């Protein structure tokens, strides 16, 4: 499946495909569509769940001070992320794109998981001891879930700290700072900063024997296909989960935008934790508005029915 910005109308029409026509009593239909914010009811569903799928987006990392590059202020220099995170942008100007990703890597090396990341990781560990399962499906490329201790983790859009050779295809972890000498001190995000225009031969290169090919970030760019094997594993998890928790995602990037609505269409409870409503909010059972680091931890903390181990 290809990574695309997802148009609101397309999402809503797909979510409601196959449902009965809306009632002519519009007030009643709207009332039925409104998700609950009753924490006790969510906690009851949480206590019963044996297989929980947690889907996370940029909002969960924003509280760690990670730039989201979305919304009105979502610019790096003069560009929005969707204008840099494409194969075409890299082909046209690999120096500029590498500056952008070098900046993001350097920022992330200074950031730590916040209470939401830690609560998810702790919950996974706790439930594992009870014979229950929690998996994390994240759109984020910052590795904060990994840093927090999440093990059942699907990073569907890749990682800032992995590179892929454009020649031999080799994928490797890379935590170097800077990633190459020419990028040292480069990547400042202010709009008046000029491009470094680094010669391509000085950009990150492959260290496989005899290759020396140009490296690129091992992330999924807009217009690229997600790893089919990874996506297949994710789909299996979504097909068997009995509770879905959506944290800090805008629900506008396809295909991840469809994950939770598809779970909801099975009649499985879905809870959204976000700073604001999203195009998918009305298809969910629960919606808890506010900072994820505040709203999520008490929601997935140890339930009174859980055995202490």
UniProtKB/Swiss-Prot annotation:
Protein keywords: Cytoplasm, Metal-binding, Mitochondrion, NAD, Nucleus, Transferase, Transit peptide, Zinc
Subcellular location: Mitochondrion; Cytoplasm, Cytosol; Nucleus
Cofactor: Zn(2+)
Family per record: Belongs to the sirtuin family. Class III subfamily.
NCBIfam families according to UniProt: PRK00481.1-3
Function: NAD-dependent lysine demalonylase, desuccinylase and deglutarylase that specifically removes malonyl, succinyl and glutaryl groups on target proteins. Has weak NAD-dependent protein deacetylase activity; however this activity may not be physiologically relevant in vivo.
Protein name: NAD-dependent protein deacylase sirtuin-5, mitochondrial
Species of origin: Xenopus tropicalis (Western clawed frog)
Upper classification of the organism: Eukaryota, Metazoa, Chordata, Craniata, Vertebrata
Originating gene: sirt5
């Amino acid at each position: 499946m290809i990574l695309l910005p997802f148009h609101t109308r397309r999402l809503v029409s797909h979510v409601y495909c196959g449902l009965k026509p809306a009632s002519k009593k519009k007030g009643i239909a709207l009332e039925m569509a409104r998700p609950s914010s009753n924490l006790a009811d969510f906690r009851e569903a949480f206590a019963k769940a044996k297989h929980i799928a947690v889907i996370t987006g940029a909002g969960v990392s924003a509280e760690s001070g990670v730039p989201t590059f979305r919304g009105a202020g979502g610019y790096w220099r003069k560009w929005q992320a969707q204008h840099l995170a494409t194969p075409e942008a890299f082909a046209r100007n690999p120096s500029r794109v590498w500056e952008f990703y070098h900046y993001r890597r350097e920022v992330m090396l200074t950031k730590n998981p916040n209470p939401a990341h830690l609560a998810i990781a702790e919950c996974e560990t706790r439930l594992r001891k009870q014979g229950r399962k929690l998996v994390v499906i994240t759109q984020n490329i910052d590795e904060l879930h990994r840093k927090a201790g999440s093990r059942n983790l699907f990073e569907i859009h890749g990682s800032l700290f992995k590179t892929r050779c454009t020649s031999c295809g080799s994928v490797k972890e890379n935590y170097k700072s800077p990633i190459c000498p020419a990028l040292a001190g480069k990547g400042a995000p202010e709009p008046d900063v000029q491009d470094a225009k680094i010669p391509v031969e000085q950009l990150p290169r492959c260290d496989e024997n005899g290759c020396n090919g140009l490296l690129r970030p091992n992330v999924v760019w807009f217009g690229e296909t997600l790893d089919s094997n990874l996506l297949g594993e994710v789909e299996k998890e979504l097909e068997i989960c009995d509770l879905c928790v959506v944290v800090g995602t805008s629900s506008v990037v396809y295909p991840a935008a469809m994950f939770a609505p598809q779970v909801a269409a099975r009649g499985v409870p879905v809870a959204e934790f976000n700073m604001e409503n999203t195009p998918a909010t009305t298809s969910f059972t629960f919606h808890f508005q506010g900072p994820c680091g505040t709203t999520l931890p008490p929601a997935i903390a140890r339930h009174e029915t859980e055995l202490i181990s």
